[in-house]
């Protein structure tokens, strides 16, 4: 983030804090803002002129887009209502939403077909020109689309907006406002009557819902205000040739912006949307009802109801629930259900959806029952503040068709937006063809996170290709684990807060046992090494000596182990670091380790002379550059869970060939 952006963000955040002090009731904030915006629109003034004098002065960064302020006010209201802190809560910026909409309208299903290739007459000898002219006329006749026909205009406004247009989480109407602005921009050269008629058609084709009465009321008022700002609604009269009267506009908007629960309710329109674009709430069940005296009971009841909910057809509505109930995953599945076959769905979701295990059923639904054709991926450091600590993704799906190729754009930055188009042509992307994609992911349809730099991209894709067909680390019957008991990934036995009295700083006194934490494992010269004062002849950092000794029960010490440090900083050069902890140490639960079957440890001792030497050999292999590239590519988020470690592709290589720990068998065919 640049210094100017930082200062503007700080300035606007300070304004919201001052507003909370002046007007603590958030519904009043929203109501006053909407009333002031309406009054300023009627008088053709900036909104600052209509705000109460007791309100803090609007900073320059908020003057130009009243809708953005409304989005933030509603986002803060929603956070407080759920018991979450409103600090650090942001709404998607207009520039981001415009990019999604322009990309869909220009380059999605609604784009006009490319004109067929014709022959240039000037480039041909005179004797060929008569033939070429007739050839070109035939081509044009075959390729023309009659835009006046019913087929060409049935589900499309003159401005090119597919209808019905839906948003099942309309919020304060952000997507609706931006689509109306694009609509007005495209009709700028049309007659006033045509603009009015096409605007009526678009309004009647809106399908906007939300579970919050406050959101629905905000969206309704915002749409009318924006239409007036665009010269399409008359706020003080019955309208004219180019403008809709306020009462008529409000009647249509009230009918098509409704307060319902799209997850548990029925869609109130007979015709499903042809274009659905939304940013569903990025909430887990445990994010709901925080601070409520009966929050736990309410969360359990809601989770149970959503898992078992049946629609009007008597069938369970949500088939892709796995693990905890996350609302954005339910909204994704519901959006596919609501849309017409052949309709388009664009959703703004956390990037974890692309790789996390719990989203696997949803990805299968996207790929195997629909045409998931595109995804944009913005990493955590892309300056999209509304993503918080998570990456942001935008998925594009054609409902009910077959997925052959997914085009993955990313990692993207805010500089990759192109005004009026979507993304710049230089935005990095790669294509996942269904066959290789299925092989890479064992048909989990995860989307890898590929670096932006061209050489790093090539190395990562090569690593994925080389490792995809290797056995997984915990598999049985492999060269590492020939027996029938699988390798387990576990965490160290000592939880720091529970054993705080038994943990102290390292002093070197007799009776102290080395206590190994994640901070003691570092990557140096291509190896994972322990930086613990008990193993170092030279002084170590205070961080490494603090809380590094165990004075509790001796039986908590463990045999030699191969351990893994998960590096949670996305800016770090590595994601996983493997090292060997010698016998006689105590492990904290910030460190994961491999629980190896007896047959594996015996095999390592026989081949390498000692268990520690065998584990050191394995650690060297696990610290390979290829495996690190793999782990970064398939990381669901900054956290490393056991499943990610378990599914690492691993095959023991020695002297350029694979080998097995089976007795009397050196190499595998």
Please state what every model-predicted region is.
Residues 195-200, 240-252, 307-311, 365-369:
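Short, conserved catalytic or adaptor-binding loops enriched in Gly and charged residues
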Residues 2-201, 207, 211-218, 261, ...:
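Class I S-adenosyl-L-methionine
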Residues 329, 336-339, 382-384, 393-394, ...:
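Polybasic, glycine- and aromatic-enriched phosphate-binding surface used to engage nucleic acids
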Residues 72, 76, 80, 99-108, ...:
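Generic, well-ordered alpha-helical scaffold segments in large soluble proteins
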């Amino acid at each position: 983030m640049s210094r100017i952006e930082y200062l503007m963000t700080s300035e606007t955040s300070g304004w919201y804090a001052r507003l909370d002090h002046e007007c603590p009731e958030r519904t009043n904030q929203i109501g006053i803002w909407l009333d002031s915006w309406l009054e300023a629109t009627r008088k053709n003034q900036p909104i600052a002129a209509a705000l109460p004098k007791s309100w803090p002065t609007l900073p320059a960064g908020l003057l130009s887009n009243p809708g953005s302020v409304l989005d933030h006010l509603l986002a803060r209201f929603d956070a407080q209502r759920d018991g979450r802190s409103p600090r650090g809560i942001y709404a998607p910026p207009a520039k981001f939403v415009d990019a999604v909409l322009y990309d869909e309208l220009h380059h999605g299903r609604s784009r006009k077909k490319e004109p067929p290739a014709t022959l240039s007459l000037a480039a041909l000898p005179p004797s060929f020109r008569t033939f070429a002219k007739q050839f070109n006329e035939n081509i044009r006749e075959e390729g023309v689309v009659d835009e006046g026909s019913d087929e060409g205009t049935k589900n499309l406004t003159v401005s090119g907006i597919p209808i019905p247009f839906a948003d099942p989480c309309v919020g304060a109407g952000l997507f609706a406002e931006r689509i109306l602005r694009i609509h007005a921009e495209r009709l700028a050269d049309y007659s006033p009557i045509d603009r009015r008629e096409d605007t009526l058609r678009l309004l009647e084709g809106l399908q906007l819902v939300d579970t919050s009465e406050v959101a629905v009321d905000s969206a309704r008022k915002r749409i009318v205000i924006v239409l007036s700002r665009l010269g399409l609604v008359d706020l003080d009269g019955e309208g004219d040739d180019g403008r809709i009267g306020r009462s008529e506009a409000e009647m249509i908007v009230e009918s098509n912006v409704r307060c319902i629960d799209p997850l548990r309710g029925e869609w109130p329109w007979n015709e499903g949307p042809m274009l659905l674009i939304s940013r569903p709430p990025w909430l887990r069940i445990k994010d709901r009802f925080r601070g409520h005296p009966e929050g736990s009971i309410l969360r359990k009841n809601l989770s149970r109801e959503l898992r078992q909910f049946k629609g009007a057809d008597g069938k369970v509505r949500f088939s892709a629930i796995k693990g905890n109930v996350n609302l954005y995953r339910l909204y994704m599945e519901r959006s596919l259900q609501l849309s017409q076959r052949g309709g388009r769905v664009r959703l703004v979701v956390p990037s974890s959806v692309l790789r996390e295990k719990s989203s696997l059923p949803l990805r299968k639904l996207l790929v195997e029952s629909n045409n998931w054709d595109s995804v944009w991926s913005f990493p955590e450091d892309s300056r999209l503040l509304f993503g918080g600590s998570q990456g942001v993704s935008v998925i594009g799906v054609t409902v009910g068709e077959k997925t052959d190729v997914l085009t993955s754009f990313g990692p993207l930055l805010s500089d990759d937006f192109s005004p009026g188009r979507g993304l710049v042509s230089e935005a990095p992307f790669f294509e996942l063809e269904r066959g290789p994609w299925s092989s890479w992911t064992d048909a989990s349809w995860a989307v890898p996170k590929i670096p932006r730099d061209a050489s790093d991209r090539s190395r990562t894709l090569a690593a994925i290709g080389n490792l995809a067909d290797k056995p997984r680390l915990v598999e049985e019957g492999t060269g590492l684990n020939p027996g029938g008991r699988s390798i387990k990934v576990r965490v160290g036995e000592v939880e720091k807060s529970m054993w705080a009295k038994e943990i102290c700083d390292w002093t070197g006194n007799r009776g102290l046992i080395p206590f190994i934490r994640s901070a003691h494992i570092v990557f140096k010269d291509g190896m994972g090494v322990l930086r613990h004062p008990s193993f170092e002849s030279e002084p170590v950092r205070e961080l490494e000596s603090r809380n590094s000794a165990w004075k509790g029960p001796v039986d908590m010490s463990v045999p030699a182990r191969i351990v893994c440090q998960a590096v949670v900083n996305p800016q770090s050069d590595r994601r996983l670091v493997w090292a060997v902890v010698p016998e006689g140490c105590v492990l904290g639960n910030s460190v994961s380790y491999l629980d190896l079957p007896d047959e594996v440890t015996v095999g390592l001792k026989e081949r390498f002379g000692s268990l520690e030497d065998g584990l050191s050999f394995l650690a060297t292999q696990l610290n390979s550059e290829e495996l690190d590239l793999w782990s970064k590519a398939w990381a669901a988020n900054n956290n490393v869970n056991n499943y990610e470690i378990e599914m690492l592709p691993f095959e023991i290589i020695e002297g350029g060939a694979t080998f097995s720990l089976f007795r009397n068998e050196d190499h595998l065919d």
